């Protein structure tokens, strides 16, 4: 809002001003206004294709985007469960490939999100021809399409004795295979932004806090009610993992400052979080950016 006289104030002339008509009026004062520029974050049309370790975050993303004050976000989801949701399986299934291509062919998808991992990537640990096929098709109908690849947490968390054992393989793969793969894609498609969404890190960090007795919202690691980190033996996301993971999706896709997010609006068991989800999300996002700065 600009400072100054409101429209309800009338300009009244005093008697002295009427009498002293021979006195030249003072020159108007020069007023310098400082207007803070505000970066408007534009909403995106985002298409997520994949399985259940990504779908809940894509489903929750619109409400988080709205809480962050971003308008016009559009979310599309094409879901197939388990291995059928990998980029390779989605491409090899003619029916689902057509479904996804029909959405992309509309030409207005800003961001295509896929999730790890195709069988051929698990074997090679270097490349994924199916991801490249999806990128090629998306760019053929909209050259301005950007891409994000999501790396989830290991399934069957109860099979691991502790968080150290649980996190060892995913951290090793993230460093030795995942980021080199992302970097290779960036070299192949320099005209597009290709991001890594490491929401799997959320599960690792939450389990670490739980095992150290520092996660007051959670009394059992795996439980539907009361909510645990995971809801079942497979390792599907409980509420706290869903909220932290969606913050990571939000921060990756829209590059917002987590401190600006109204975290008090997020509830678990009807209560606000004691755990600093914003700080955890920001740390994970910052570490991904640091890796990008070293390798990109």
Where are these regions (language model features)?
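C-terminal motif of bacterial Sec signal peptides marking the signal peptidase cleavage site
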Residues: 3-4
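Short, conserved catalytic or interaction motifs in soluble domains
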Residues: 7
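N-terminal low-complexity, Pro/Thr/Ser-rich intrinsically disordered segments
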Residues: 14-45
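Solvent-exposed, acidic/flexible segments
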Residues: 50, 54, 58, 93, ...
